[in-house]
């Protein structure tokens, strides 16, 4: 294991009553796997400079400073050796030359691949995503200067320690997201960086530095998001919606994040997801937030906070867009008072989701079905009794769908301005979900024939029956009787029912 200890000197105002800054010393160590250290030292011993760089360095520092546990899967290596020289250094090992035109050589070592890339600079981003021109450069600083954020522009090797020309370690310590150099240039080079910046801020509790924030909000920059593929947009959105719940554990932080998305980045997000504008200026009378988008964002954050990592991407999308059709579903039913309601809100919201959101993303068929089903049933009233829960489970089609609906209703209710007995209602919802789990786990609710506690072979043996229409009729009848509560789903009960009702067929 390669390791080097570095003292990070951080200027802070330790005493709130004093404007005098103090210096706080923080020890940061970098531990490298044996194979990574071997690669670095082999290059160094051949006369080249070599460092690990990027996410592995950033997350190592974060894990030590904040006691987080970000997994480190890849170690990207940068060097002043050319691709040809890299291949000469590692000629005794299997080399995968797929990235040579970008200056990257992949070396296979102990059944694991490692990417080694020559120092380079990039220019001419005609598609605002990929560099048209790549040139090799001679210094590490030139290579680091092309990177997106200061926190990603830190290099390390076990002989020199950390190399940090843009003060990325200080920005990590201060939880600051800052572009390297001119933020407008960095974001126009690769428009996807805009979403990465917002993702880092929302998932790690970092603050976006002012000039970087202005660049994100600049339409001359975010307009290029239209050129980013649906796959990459969806991938960033998935990462953005997965968050450490401890980062949003107070209402103040939730308010800050909602305010950030609503006030600062709405226009940017609307470029990739036009459905946001449909909820922008529509007021919500029952929410803690006067605008509907605020309520939907609050529902999203409540979902993530209350259920930690036990929620799906589909559920997040429903939290965001369950009311997207409210403009079009509104009906004034009392002209005198102006009282209104929203018949067919679920159907309208599904229609608007298909028209305004779905074309912008790349979702699986399973996710699309989940999202549309949950939007349709979002406002269903849940009654905590066996018959109702059985019917609702069958209507939704799975315990997982019931669980998702339960999570959404809890998250939504936590933003209900007029909750008279919030704890009582939340307990009621929880008991409903527990009853659903009990019914499914005890096989008192059967979604499919295979859930019956009797097999087709058992029926054939009981009745000496060949597979055919009668056979299917028996299985379907058993399924219906179990779900109606007329028959227990035990082998003994099912066998008796078959012998009593089908023995002569």
Task: Tell where the protein language model's regions lie, with residue ranges.
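Catalytic cores of the polymerase beta-like nucleotidyltransferase superfamily
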Residues: 1-505
